[in-house]
């Protein structure tokens, strides 16, 4: 039997939004506290536009533990091992688990009407966390 090394090129990971605070530089934490409720409301609105609630809920049935691999290292390794995946390219997550990086630093990175310093702060916070994952 031939052996193959499997590298996934479409994995997603993100921390639960409120937990990003500890990964931000302290000077950005007040802005984070103010922005978090707005970000969560925007994600909930996006869910209404992009997800069919009933289909999403049906798909998620029985998958909660595996989906927690988006932020739980132990669960992620278990799922990857079960799938035979040896490595992965990881993208920041977003709508389905509400675990997008702060200040718009996730997928669909906005380019207008954003504070670039805060966006970079969100990206750095995500990368700090990702280095621990």
Where in this protein do the model-derived segments appear?
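Helix-coil boundary/capping segments in enzymes
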Residues: 1-133
């Amino acid at each position: 039997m031939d052996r193959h090394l499997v590298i996934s090129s479409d994995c997603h990971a993100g921390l639960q939004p409120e937990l990003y605070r500890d990964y931000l530089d302290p000077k950005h934490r007040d802005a984070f506290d103010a922005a978090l409720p707005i970000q969560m409301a925007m994600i909930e609105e996006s869910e209404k536009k992009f997800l069919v609630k009933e289909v999403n809920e049906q798909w998620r049935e029985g998958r909660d533990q595996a989906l927690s691999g988006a932020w739980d290292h132990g669960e992620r390794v278990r799922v990857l091992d079960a799938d035979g995946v040896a490595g992965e390219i990881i993208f920041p997550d977003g709508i389905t688990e509400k675990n997008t990086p702060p200040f718009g630093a996730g997928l669909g990175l906005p380019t207008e009407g954003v504070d670039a310093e805060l966006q970079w702060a969100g990206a750095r916070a995500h990368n700090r966390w990702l280095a621990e994952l």
